[in-house]
Amino acid sequence: MAKVLYITAHPHDEKTSYSMATGKAFIDSYKESNPNDEVVHIDLYKENIPHIDADVFSGWGKLQSGTGFEELSENEKAKVGRLNELSDQFAAADKYVFVTPLWNFSFPPVMKAYLDSVAVAGKSFKYTEQGPIGLLTDKKALHIQARGGYYSEGPAADMEMGHRYIGIMMNFFGVPSFDGLIVEGHNAEPNKAQQIKEDAIARAKEAGKSF
């Protein structure tokens, strides 16, 4: 039985969001094809995802110097403890499905905060004399992204930084399989928007059967 993290970063649901509609089609298809797998939905707009701030750095510093966890301040314990939970959960999973829109050439800031929370030495990667090495070498990941314009090719291709960033992080973590399911052009060509959405949902259903 595999454990799948279904990680969504959108304030809207599948009724108004192209990425969320595509994501729902994918994960429903996946569940149907893999009824024994465990799927955990992490809604980044509802979950507590601490930012790496002064409390976190202070707590980490104290722990590294030998201070016990219970001796940290209440804020330090809450934030550091939650970051530990998130990074442990991520390392223990087998598959990751990220769902985001393309906002200002990237993804919503809650996704950056989440990726920061799971980028932990000793869990998702480790430092060696030859440089950092990813530890998640038996995982696989998929990014479902909706883009109102066209960024797969053409003059805007170099401006897309959301899908590329997640790919860079998965590579850094050692994840050997990373794919994208991209929905694009629905704002650029509103007369084709419904067909674009239907095509994306159909692709998502097929992808969910074999992920």
UniProtKB/Swiss-Prot annotation:
Quinone reductase that provides resistance to thiol-specific stress caused by electrophilic quinones. Also exhibits azoreductase activity. Catalyzes the reductive cleavage of the azo bond in aromatic azo compounds to the corresponding amines. The keyword Thylakoid does not apply. The gene is azoR. This is FMN-dependent NADH:quinone oxidoreductase. Homodimer. It comes from the Bacteria. GO terms for molecular function: electron transfer activity; FMN binding; oxidoreductase activity, acting on NAD(P)H as acceptor; oxidoreductase activity, acting on NAD(P)H, quinone or similar compound as acceptor. Binds 1 FMN per subunit. Its EC number is 1.6.5.-, 1.7.1.17.
